[in-house]
Amino acid sequence: MRLIKLPKGKHQCLIYATAMLLDVEPSEIIEILGHDGMDIWWPELAVPNCFRGVHIQEILDVCAHFGYGLICYQVMPRTSPFGRVDMVRNIFEVDKALERIDRYLKEPGLIVTDVHACAWDGESVYDPNGMITSIQSVALKEFYLLKRI
């Protein structure tokens, strides 16, 4: 996997992570999307929250364009009765959840945290901020496993 660094001032981690995962240029992703995610949709909010961004559903379409699908695995899935946020429960015990996600991390995909996205080659995290790091350095929330469709 090739590290592609975000230009300063750009808030396009999902575009760049996807480009690394698919081994294409970010400009190809932007062309397929029809936008770069940098339109200001919420001018009352500070940077980067003011930007349109890119939704993961758009990235699913981009991957399909290249003949791939993404399968989402949440690290710690939770459930509750409808509308009862006071009754949320984890589906798995922590040990089982970590063992489960480790099985899927043997293959390439997208690493998603609450506020950032990176590419994963099955061994290392390729961070669009310009670093190659270990999975332990990331607050992983969801893993999107890349599969040929």
Language model segments and positions:
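Active-site nucleophile-adjacent alpha helix/oxyanion-hole segment immediately C-terminal to the catalytic cysteine
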Residues: 1-50, 57, 61, 65-71
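Context-gated lysine
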Residues: 5-10, 96, 106, 141, ...
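Conserved active-site-adjacent core of cysteine acyl-enzyme catalytic domains
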Residues: 40-115, 121-130, 138-139
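Glycine-rich, aromatic-bearing surface loops/beta-hairpins
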Residues: 129-149
